[in-house]
């Protein structure tokens, strides 16, 4: 019997009509809150490093300049006292770290996912795809499998597990979810980024100041979004449309940010020129993303930028002459949570849509229609996502 449909007809039936859309956002942190003003004393005490007075003063200056007010960490004083090797600089401790993150990464991801699913308001059986991202540990079956079981998702949900990507990956997961949603009619993609610093926490050492930068910046957090095309406006509330997404490796940036999984945990290596490398290339990324739209004024778009640290934000602002309010949501999340790696940009997206409603703006993007989301991380890799906001009057806020 001859086929009644062509391949082209099958493909057209499989594709969505409209762009991928963020339909819900949820975030979660551990209960343990650490205030930055107190952290240097705590960190040098718990790592038994108070004798390193000069290094402690350097660390205090790092924390003072970080623009971070507080962070959340699963690692408590009690956990660290039970695992002294995690407090050393070079002691073998990977097994202890793995035992923690294998359990806690999916658990924190579940808390964020439950909030997103509640806001979405649809049955979990409608989730067709799961994208899970973490830089915290590796395991088989992965955190995607664990979360599928925890949430009671269908066993046939199509899963993608992303381990060890780093800070740019909040953009990566949106790019992947966009492709999944737009190429699978009716797809609803649950995206989860969950990060626990138990894999990177370690004691100080005079020869490794870039490791101290990480100790001053990193915090724990998980964020989840639900993404789908062609939303059913009778039951779903769009928040942002994902218009385009791209990834690039910056020229002459090899070795600028590295992470290596070793017996001592995930070690962090950073070159001083990271803010310069990013700011030098930011305008090109913006031009390539917005030229098709005829946009070349960077204060006319809303900004969601991975808050790798204040120096990166300062130099990007200076390079493209940004008004201070453009980075308000980004700097707020930096202040209140620190650097949560892949989860950061989703926290910022959540902050932006909530504050836009509170401040009486017309759209979820601080009153503007178009926006940009940047992920920066190892490579140096940059993810660029062009967003379109939706009118708040359409019920687009949580």
Swiss-Prot record:
Keyword Transferase applies: yes
CDD domains for the chain: CHS_like
Annotated pathway: Secondary metabolite biosynthesis; flavonoid biosynthesis
Keyword Acyltransferase assigned: yes
Lineage: superkingdom: Eukaryota
Ranges annotated as spanning the membrane: none
Database matches in Gene3D superfamilies: 3.40.47.10
Residue positions of the active site: 167
Alphabetical GO biological process terms: flavonoid biosynthetic process; polyketide biosynthetic process
A molecular-function term among this protein's GO annotations: naringenin-chalcone synthase activity
UniProt keyword annotations, A-Z: Acyltransferase, Flavonoid biosynthesis, Transferase
EC number: 2.3.1.74
Reactions that this protein is recorded to catalyse: (E)-4-coumaroyl-CoA + 3 malonyl-CoA + 3 H(+) = 2',4,4',6'-tetrahydroxychalcone + 3 CO2 + 4 CoA
InterPro entries assigned to the protein according to its UniProt record, in alphabetical order: Chalcone/stilbene_synt_C, Chalcone/stilbene_synt_N, Chalcone/stilbene_synthase_AS, Polyketide_synthase_type-III, Thiolase-like
Job description of the protein: The primary product of this enzyme is 4,2',4',6'-tetrahydroxychalcone (also termed naringenin-chalcone or chalcone) which can under specific conditions spontaneously isomerize into naringenin.
Family: Belongs to the thiolase-like superfamily. Chalcone/stilbene synthases family.
Protein name as catalogued: Chalcone synthase 1
